[in-house]
Amino acid sequence: MALEFPVIDPIIFSVGPLSVRWYGLMYLIGFAFAMWFANRQAAKPNSGWTKDQVGDFLFYGMLGVILGGRIGYVLFYQFSYFIENPLYLFRIDQGGMSFHGGTLGVITAVVIFAWTRKKSILQVGDFVAPLVPVGLLAGRIGNFINGELWGRVSDVPWAMVFPTGGPLARHPSQLYEAFFEGLVLFLILQWFIKKPRPAGSVAGVFLLGYGTFRFCIEYFRQPDAQLGLFADFISMGQILSLPMIVGGLGLLIWAYKQATQKTAVKG
């Protein structure tokens, strides 16, 4: 027997024409955590960051998430529709955000911020990477509350019948993503940053971890209706995750190789 989906009104409350939604609140929670955690990290001795720099980057980062997420969704998942309806890019009221697009937006923000502040791109990336997973966790919970991005049909005991997913029970894949891409990845990064690490390695762990978790969970997530599976076996989410896996692994190997070479020179 399938579990009953806990139907929650996506709108928390409304004041006149203004509605406050759970999904928007989740974005706010993710941003608030990032601000708190970043300031906490910046306050540590020799962090190389000031409170003002944290605030400046978070502004750039927020723009990167929003603009990159929206542009990425339109280009990756709705490209054909966008070609016929270019103004769809600005129809944010119709929803649609891509984490992979948001990642590209944040990477762009990292590069711009590092260049304008005369900081190392790798060090900025390492500082930013641990801020992301809690935002992912909150965002996926928002997806679950909205009853969207559900999983494939399943008979597991915890499968649910989603309001927009037809009569069959499905994997609550949003919760899988919240757990692995959010909580587990956050804990991995917290363990990893307890010790000094080579420049670029923290960002590498994030890219590798997220890409791997997302690639695997895509097997439980319903493919996008307008795209389906490419070659009948791989989803768009998996295609976009592969560069993250390869890039993260490559960055990790390069970072530790550089650290080893520096140690050998000093020795």
Curated annotation (Swiss-Prot):
InterPro entries: Lgt (IPR001640). Its EC number is 2.5.1.145. The chain crosses the membrane at residues 18-38, 57-77, 95-115, 173-193, 200-220, 233-253. A 1,2-diacyl-sn-glycero-3-phospho-(1'-sn-glycerol) binds at R140. It comes from the Bacteria. It is found in: Cell inner membrane. One of its GO terms (biological process) is lipoprotein biosynthetic process. Pathway: Protein modification; lipoprotein biosynthesis (diacylglyceryl transfer). It comes from Pseudoalteromonas translucida (strain TAC 125). PANTHER family: PHOSPHATIDYLGLYCEROL--PROLIPOPROTEIN DIACYLGLYCERYL TRANSFERASE (PTHR30589:SF0), PROLIPOPROTEIN DIACYLGLYCERYL TRANSFERASE (PTHR30589). The keyword Cell wall biogenesis/degradation does not apply. It is an enzyme of class 2 (transferase). The keyword Metal-binding does not apply. It is a multi-pass membrane protein. GO terms for cellular component: plasma membrane. Catalyzes the transfer of the diacylglyceryl group from phosphatidylglycerol to the sulfhydryl group of the N-terminal cysteine of a prolipoprotein, the first step in the formation of mature lipoproteins. This is Phosphatidylglycerol--prolipoprotein diacylglyceryl transferase. The gene is lgt. One of its GO terms (molecular function) is phosphatidylglycerol-prolipoprotein diacylglyceryl transferase activity. Keywords: Cell inner membrane, Cell membrane, Membrane, Transferase, Transmembrane, Transmembrane helix. Belongs to the Lgt family. Its main location: membrane.
